[in-house]
Amino acid sequence: MVGLLGKKVGMSQLFDAEGQQIPVTVIEVGPCFVTAVRTKEKDGYVAAQLGFDVVKEKKLTKARLGGLRKANLAALNLLKEIRTEDVSNLSVGSELRADNFEVGEFVDVRGISIGKGFQGVVKRLNYKGGASKGHGSMFGRVPGSIGAQAGGRGCRKKVRKGKGLPGQMGNEKVCVKSLKVMKVDAENNLLVLKGSVPGFEGRYLVVCSALKGGKKNPWKVRGGKQESPKEAPSEASKVETPQEGTKTSS
């Protein structure tokens, strides 16, 4: 799995070859820097800790700033760990950009949704409410009965856990799955996804390869160690071996 940290820029629209309008979201992903590498032997799991968004040093705690200075990195405001299968080509200080994703693949986006304050059950939980036509309603938008309150034989005089009631709406962790990558701007570190993502403009996001139907691409690193490509066999090393049942010239 490949993942990057980013920030929501805003929404726009694209048009396909048939002229159909496609709503898209623009996300600034990277440049991200590897601040730590977790291995199975040392930490018990495999992951890469990434840092994003350079800010002034006075905005960070001394503990975080000391760890970043030890790794010779700038003051990064956001640090997140991303579970992955292989970290062999990652090292502390490696730079990751938007070209880790390809056009046409699917990604999952995690973030915090927009808070909408204290809301009732009709808006928060899609309750139907009372009738709005005819003779009107006796209870309108109130939740109605929430359980037995008489306390008689066989009745529990309490509200069951999980009962839908009015309360805080939004401002919670949300994961939007399988969004298609429409465009990748590696120079400006921009990723264009089909559809919407949680949060308002400027909200931090985590973009990872989709768990369902996503590609398992290797990490593309800039400024870190990379695996050397395998050399193609030379013409001299290609020796034809006779197959069984064929005659060789003497």
Place the predicted regions along the sequence by residue.
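Extended basic (Lys/Arg/His-rich) segments that typically form rRNA-contacting surfaces
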Residues: 1-250
